[in-house]
């Protein structure tokens, strides 16, 4: 018969199990218990005793477990960061100067990275079968095009009465400067409902957008700038901005409710 004794060590607890003459240790989070010693009987009825576990020994066990976990996570992050589909491009991470991408052209003339083409087509077809008509509003952009969009947004803000500094700061909440836009990777598509092609807050109320947000991970996409994560992504919530990361990563990120920055620990 096994009996367990829990020994508190700050925020960690060592569980000691006696099986016959053997002693086993387990670790779990705990608070408030003090070290104890005890005695018990094994299956033969023979009296036995547990030597008191010292705080140093228990701490070493906890530290070993923590180091093992940290090492394993470091390896996972290293592999994730090597994955080209998980390339992080944001306000703090520029697109590599030597970045190149093979493009595929959609029927409407937009271009996307070849690697995402099939899954994108499958997602749009599935949306159509579900009764929703989805339009690609934007996809791959050259650096020149990205800069044009930023300047247009700044001019619009100036027209609306903002100072130059205010206009630039406001524009950067929604439009990235060239070299720092995910659209330059070819992995991004802005998708809108055919009956509402506005890139604003009304988009998330459309049936098409609701379907996309619920199902995009099945096809390797994530909602890149989710609501409530603005301080992490650096951008305002965009219900139409979908980023391809591959099916496995999309599934994990959706289940864990994390952004690409969090997934890569960047």
State where each predicted segment sits.
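Extracytoplasmic cell-surface/polysaccharide-interacting catalytic and binding patches
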Residues: 2-266
